[in-house]
Amino acid sequence: PLSEYASQKLLSEKIILNNGGVVIRLTKILSKETELIKDWQNLLSSNKQINAFSNLPLAPLNVDFVCEFIKKVIDKNSKGLFQLSPKDDIKYIDIAKRLANKINSNENLVNSVLAKPIDIGYKSIPEFATLDMTREELDFSIKCPKSDEVLNLIGI
C-alpha cells in the first residue's frame, strides 16, 4: 500500500471478505459538484490561476456507472472483491486544461505543478490509477469506460 489509508482499507477488505461480504474498489468518482472541479471552475471563471498536478494520474468514474454496477452485484447476489475503473488514466493537469477550454477560459491560467508524495499522503507517486476490470466486464457484461467518455458525461 502507498499510504496509511490504503493499509487500513486493505485490512478492512480482508475482514469484509472473510465474512462473506462484498468489496467494490473504485477509482475516483468525479462530477461537476466535486469540490476540486468546482474550485477550479470558480477560479478560472474569475480569470485566476490554478495549479494542477502534471505527474499524478487519475482514473475518473461517473456516479451513474458506479450505481449501475452496484445494482448488478446486488441483482446477482454476488460476493467477493470487485473493481471499477476506466480503461485509461488522465493527469490532473489534462483535466484542468480541458475544464478551462470547456468554460471558455484561458488555458494559460492552468499551472503545471509536481505532486510530492509527502504532500498527498503517499509513499511514492503512483504510475497508474486504473484497476483491472477484466473479470467485471466478463461476469457482469459491462463495458469499462474511457476517461474521455467519463469526462464528457460529467460535462468536462
Where are the model-predicted features located?
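N-terminal Rossmann-like NAD(P)+-binding domain of SDR-like oxidoreductases, especially those catalyzing
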Residues: 1-4, 12, 18-19
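Active-site helix of classical SDR
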Residues: 8
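NAD(P)-dependent short-chain dehydrogenase/reductase
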Residues: 14-58, 63-65
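Mid/C-terminal beta-alpha module of Rossmann-like enzyme folds, strongest
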Residues: 69, 76-122
